[in-house]
């Protein structure tokens, strides 16, 4: 399975954060530019996807048809996970979709509600340090001015009863000496209700 965590960085085949998804219920929270729910469905899971963009949903449905897999698609805010009952989901993946969320704690509470106890929530996002720099490596923003800081992210997960068990800071494979990691990937596990 090849879950996409960002351009030119390691994917699921190398990081192994999701495990075997066959027979599991998996939600892609925000459709990635490489739709992960297709790979999830190809891996034998019941794949579900939620995205606020109607065009992303339409493109995902067409891709699912081309790959001859079924993906249950839902259009709505990333916190609108009402289609899944409490403690019924085995894995949630959000690849580069949480940065634009206005109310991250609300999204995390809803993900916590639908996940089974101990189930993982895998999140990939632009690394908070990478947001500080322009493409020529000049300083563009102060840390935290353009995105969440790592401590903001960590505390939001802690306050919603998640525990990080894996953190990866990934660098673009094309660069020889990167000034900062480009992608932050975390796996958080749902603690008790």
What are these regions (language model features)?
Residues 25-80:
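Class I SAM-dependent methyltransferase SAM/SAH-binding core
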Residues 79, 83-92:
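A short acidic, Gly/Pro-enriched loop at the edge of an enzyme's catalytic core
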Residues 90-105:
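A short SAM/SAH-binding and catalytic strip from SAM-dependent methyltransferases
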Residues 105-120:
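A short glycine-rich, Lys/Arg-flanked "PGG" loop and its adjoining helix->strand segment in the class I
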Residues 120-145:
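Conserved class I S-adenosyl-L-methionine
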Residues 145-167:
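Short alpha-helix
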Residues 160-162, 177-193:
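Core SAM-dependent methyltransferase catalytic element
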């Amino acid at each position: 399975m090849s879950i996409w965590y960002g351009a030119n960085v390691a994917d699921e085949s190398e990081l192994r954060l999701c495990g075997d998804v066959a027979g599991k219920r998996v939600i892609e929270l925000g459709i990635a530019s490489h739709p992960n729910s297709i790979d999830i469905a190809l891996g034998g899971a019941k794949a579900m996807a939620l995205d606020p963009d109607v065009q992303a949903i339409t493109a995902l449905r067409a891709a699912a048809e081309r790959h001859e897999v079924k993906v249950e698609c839902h259009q709505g805010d990333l916190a609108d996970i009402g289609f899944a009952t409490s403690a019924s989901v085995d894995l949630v993946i959000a690849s580069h979709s949480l940065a634009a969320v206005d109310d991250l704690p609300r999204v995390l509470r809803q993900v916590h509600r639908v996940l089974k106890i101990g189930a993982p929530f895998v999140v990939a996002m632009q690394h908070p340090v990478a947001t500080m720099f322009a493409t020529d490596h000049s300083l563009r923003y102060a840390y935290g001015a353009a995105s969440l800081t790592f401590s903001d992210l960590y505390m939001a997960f802690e306050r919603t009863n998640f525990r990080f068990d894996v953190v990866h800071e990934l660098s673009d494979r094309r660069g020889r000496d990167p000034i900062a990691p480009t992608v932050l990937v975390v796996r958080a596990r749902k603690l008790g209700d």
